[in-house]
């Protein structure tokens, strides 16, 4: 569905809406966008939660460790919320400029939903990122891929109310169904991850 093109969107909106360029990749831009979101999440964890985990292990249970841990938890919770907000704003501006309801190159919604799906495994990912190159690292990779696969499946399947909320105006309609898919993925990740981990032992 196309609408009358509107004012030109700022450059930042295009960067965010296209998932920093990942939405330009073909084929399956949504999958590329989700994969890029996973890599960005892993990089953020490698720069924050991974070094904190090592530091906390060496310093034991201290008030300072608890305070830093809470601050880091708040930061990691804020990330998918901030990404959702930015995705709505950016998609709104791009949709307004192009007159296209939900073009395939907009993958900021995949970034938001994927980060929501990844959030439950934040500490598992943080503590195991650097084990990928060690013997048995493929098992860690399989476990890390679980939120990615579940989110992509739910994003394509679109369980209720994903189809209904796609009718919301502008960026809300672009992003809302992916947020719901990410939220649906959370309980599945929490249930399936320990089962898969036990199978891979």
Language model segments and positions:
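Juxtamembrane boundary at the C-terminal end of a transmembrane helix
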Residues: 191-201
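Membrane-interface interhelical connector segments
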Residues: 50-66, 127, 131-132
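Extended, non-catalytic scaffold segments that flank or surround catalytic motifs
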Residues: 20, 41, 133-137
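Short helix-loop boundary/capping segments at the starts of domains
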Residues: 22, 41, 45-49, 100
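Alpha-helical transmembrane segments
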Residues: 38, 42-46, 57, 66-90, ...
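Interhelical loop and helix-boundary elements at the membrane-water interface
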Residues: 2-36, 65-66, 86-118, 130, ...
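Membrane-interfacial alpha-helical segments at the cytosolic side of multi-pass membrane proteins
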Residues: 35-45, 113-125, 185-193
């Amino acid at each position: 569905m196309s609408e009358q093109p509107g004012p030109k969107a700022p450059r930042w909106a295009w960067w965010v809406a296209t998932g920093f360029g990942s939405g330009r990749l073909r084929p399956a831009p949504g999958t590329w966008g989700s994969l890029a979101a996973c890599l960005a999440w892993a990089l953020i964890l490698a720069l924050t939660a991974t070094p904190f985990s090592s530091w906390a292990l060496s310093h034991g249970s201290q008030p300072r460790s608890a305070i830093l841990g809470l601050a880091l938890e708040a930061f990691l919770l804020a990330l998918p919320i901030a990404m959702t907000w930015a995705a709505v704003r950016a998609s709104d501006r791009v949709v307004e400029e192009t007159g296209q309801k939900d073009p395939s190159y907009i993958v900021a919604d995949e970034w938001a939903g994927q980060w929501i799906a990844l959030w439950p495994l934040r500490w598992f990912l943080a503590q195991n990122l650097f084990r990928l190159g060690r013997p048995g690292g493929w098992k860690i990779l399989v476990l890390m891929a679980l939120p990615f696969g579940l989110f992509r499946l739910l994003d394509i399947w679109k369980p209720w109310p994903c189809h209904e909320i796609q009718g919301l105006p502008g960026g809300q309609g672009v992003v809302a169904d992916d947020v719901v898919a990410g939220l649906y993925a959370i309980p599945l990740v929490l249930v399936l991850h320990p089962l898969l981990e036990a199978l891979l032992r």
